[in-house]
Amino acid sequence: MNPIFETYFTRFEAFEQQSQKPVDRNLGIIVTIPCYHEPDILQTLNCLWNCTMPSCHIEVIIVVNHSETADNSIKQFNQKTFEQLCEYSSAKSTGTISFLPLAAFNISKKQAGVGYARKLAMDEAVHRFAQIDNPEGVIVSCDADTIVDKNYFIEIETFYRNNPQCSAANIYFEHPLTGDLQQGQYQAIAQYELYLRYYVEQLKRIGFPYAFHTIGSCFSVRAKTYCRQGGMNKRQAGEDFYFLQKLFPAECFGEINITTVHPSSRQSDRVPFGTGTAIAELKQSRQELMTYSTESFNILQDFFVRSKSLQNASEQEIRDTYESLHPCLKKFLPSSDFEQKIIEIQHNTKTHEQFCKRFFRWFNGLQVYKFLNFSCGNGFQKIPIGTAAKELFDKTDMDIFSLLQFYRLRAKKENKE
């Protein structure tokens, strides 16, 4: 067995192998899908089955899961779903794509959730690649209510073949804005996606080096990289955010934007937060989604500029820099923490590039998010997403849908450059 697989299985809390199904020697991409009380899973699988196939073999691992405390109706629904998936696998698996349903039923209440199911699926993908000694194999994270473009597999394969230095990548996404749902629901999802894109654009503007989306249905990672970073966590929600925050500073991260993933626009209560929950809350409140003001981001921008100049600074210069920071940031970040961390970074780096990289490993995406929330209670109120998105690029004449289209086009253009 390749040492990187062996290390992962022995050092980290990896799940044991679930399936004894033979592995195709040409296996190159594995799509992993958590599935909980999901009525549209066959629509997602049919979409994957209808994609143009790449040169490598494809596997799709679906983990049907529920907690030991789930309602009997959900348990019965999931049991029926699993049986349907087994029948689907027998009928639809071919020489180019195969489906592998797994059942994770009656998980302990403490562990049950999408993180558990996603980790089980991704760990199984590692076991599959380990059997054919393919550490370069690509694990794709998807969701059970997601649709993808026909060139999905082709573009994933092409990206990793043409970018051997890249260890992981996001896949461009757009939520559906038309269809059979109520107009209010599409209004809500447009606000939510605009919120996500506004946030990333602000991160880019202020010089944060890891300005990427963190969406569970839209990322991919090489098997060796997944292992190197300790694998997925079992969080009941937000598992994608925390996993990707580990990847961004440690690996070469790219973006695949020639194909598109279409996450569901429906409301849901399956996880404590996320797309479905946000849509439900917006519909119920009938208010505009609120976001962080440009002023809050500007405080971070100034902080980053000042901190990046401290590679060779004396202790007094570090203290002086701290005193020059915005009062809100100083309230968030105690002087002793800042000084100790900068000195530690100085002692462990030799070049400015190393200094900056280590600095942003410390003040990472989670720290940014925490500060922005902190600032909202300390003088910087949130503002409506429509107002914020208009002000950032001076687009005062646009409605929510036009703004979202502008931000989408901008994201695609930036990713190409």
Where on the chain are the PLM-derived regions?
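A recurrent flexible, glycine/aromatic-enriched loop bordering the glycosyltransferase active site
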Residues: 200-220
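Acidic donor-binding/catalytic loop of UDP-sugar-dependent glycosyltransferases
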Residues: 123, 133-137, 141-159
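Active-site-proximal specificity loops/subdomain of glycosyltransferases
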Residues: 71-136
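Acidic donor-binding loop at a coil-to-helix junction in glycosyltransferase catalytic cores
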Residues: 235-242
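Catalytic donor-sugar/metal-binding loop of nucleotide-sugar-dependent glycosyltransferases
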Residues: 235, 247-262
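Conserved donor NDP-sugar-binding/catalytic core segment of glycosyltransferases
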Residues: 150-189
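Terminal low-complexity segments of carbohydrate-biosynthetic enzymes
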Residues: 1, 280-417
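Short, acidic, metal-binding catalytic loop of nucleotide-sugar glycosyltransferases
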Residues: 25, 46-59, 66-70, 77, ...
